[in-house]
């Protein structure tokens, strides 16, 4: 609870928590049994900045202690900063895979993963459904 900034809420009822606080509690519940692999589907979507920061810090800590994290996100800049390996998918198919550094080196006319996505798919991120 302390790592997620929730220690002072230990004796509070969960229905009084904000959405971001509930997201952090759910993440803590997911790691209670110390899984070797953790699957997360957009864990920072729709949360406040404080919760997002706490979640990312916690995930970095988990990863540094040996937990493999499979992390889905539509926020490619967040993925670029957080992930060591990235697969760019479009319509269920892998379009590119590698470390952020290797992907950026493989597509020299791009500045970030969003540019690579657009180059590979011909779609702007907002056009993707």
Go through each PLM region and give its residues:
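ABC ATPase "signature
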Residues: 97-98
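A short, surface-exposed alpha-helical micro-motif characterized by mixed small hydrophobic
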Residues: 79-81
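Catalytic Walker B motif of ABC-type/P-loop ATPase nucleotide-binding domains
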Residues: 38-41
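Conserved ABC ATPase signature
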Residues: 13-17
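Helical segment within the ABC ATPase nucleotide-binding domain
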Residues: 53-65
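Conserved ABC ATPase "signature" region
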Residues: 1-9
């Amino acid at each position: 609870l302390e790592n997620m900034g929730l220690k002072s809420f230990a004796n509070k009822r969960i229905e009084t928590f904000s959405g971001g606080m509930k997201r952090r509690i759910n993440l803590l519940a997911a790691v209670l049994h110390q899984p070797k692999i953790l699957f997360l589907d957009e864990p920072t979507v729709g949360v406040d900045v404080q919760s997002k920061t706490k979640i990312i810090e916690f995930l970095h800590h988990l990863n540094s202690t040996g937990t493999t994290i499979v992390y889905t996100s539509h926020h490619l800049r967040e993925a670029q900063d957080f992930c060591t390996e990235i697969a760019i998918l479009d319509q269920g198919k892998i379009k590119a895979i590698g470390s952020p550094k290797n992907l950026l080196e493989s597509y020299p006319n791009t500045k970030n993963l969003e540019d690579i996505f657009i180059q590979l798919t011909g779609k702007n991120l907002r056009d993707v459904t």
